[in-house]
Amino acid sequence: MTDSTYDVARVRTYLQGLQTRIADALGALDGTPLATDIWQRGPAERLRGGGCTRILEGGRVFERAGIGFSDVAGDALPPSASAARPQLAGRGFEALGVSLVLHPRNPYCPTVHMNVRMLIATKPGEAPIFWFGGGMDLTPVYGFEDDARHFHRTCKDALDPFGAELYPRFKKWCDEYFFLKHRNEMRGVGGIFFDDFSEPGFERSFEMMQSVGDAFLPAYLPIVERRAALPYGERERDFQAYRRGRYVEFNLVFDRGTLFGLQSGGRTESILMSMPPVANWRYNWQPEPGSPEARLYSDFIVPRDWV
């Protein structure tokens, strides 16, 4: 875009505060504080900068919960970031964002992912180009219509002040992005996804990103509070591990954030904290017709209008 005026310091302050707010809320819900791992890359390394990882493993509610903040810079955008905008290939960059994935212990609690980020591409003698990206999406093992509707309504409410066209646009983008092409199935019930967003200018784009970040806790926590105490057994845990396998497949094969981190020389522990602690694969497994497991495929991981 032509307007190159932006304020990285304000974005950084917001993102660090968002990470802290979410980590505190999850720790209070679980009863276990999230550990803090602050990391830094040296000026001579391929990727410079640092960040903070907040992590919980083996909790009462969350089997694994990871929330990462990073602010890194490099000399050339990796291919995953410039594939859709080849004119940016080879530019230097700064990328800062918060990304989280939560894997609850109870199979009736859905996995969730959220990310908000800003990227700046630079080239000597030319104005910097910035954009925002992010979104959130819900991946149930056992679907509940109330949960999907609540999650989508909260996403819509976060976007509506910035234009009624944004929710349907970002919802469709999410359905198309979180799709396992080799399985011909969606990863979950979707949510919202956006990238390369800078159309309204810095201030309005930043406000929209903040609205998405601020909507995460009200979108997700009520679902966990409804489902975390539901009884479950070995059958449900087995299906949870099987569905987590799909999560692994998507993140390692398709996810642009994972590819960006690995291609740019990012911190592997932070990049792969999105992986579930336990996952499995079964050869040519099919759910029993009419079962709750079959309903996930027929009623939930298909494109639907949830609002």
Curated annotation (Swiss-Prot):
PROSITE patterns referenced in this protein's UniProt entry, alphabetically: COPROGEN_OXIDASE (PS01021)
Reaction(s) this enzyme catalyzes, per UniProt: coproporphyrinogen III + O2 + 2 H(+) = protoporphyrinogen IX + 2 CO2 + 2 H2O
Binding site for a divalent metal cation: 103, 113, 152, 182
A GO term from the CC aspect: cytoplasm
Pfam families: Coprogen_oxidas (PF01218)
Cofactor(s) the protein needs: a divalent metal cation
UniProt-annotated catalytic positions: 113 (proton donor)
Family of the protein in this entry: Belongs to the aerobic coproporphyrinogen-III oxidase family.
Assembly information from the UniProt record: Homodimer.
Name of the protein: Oxygen-dependent coproporphyrinogen-III oxidase
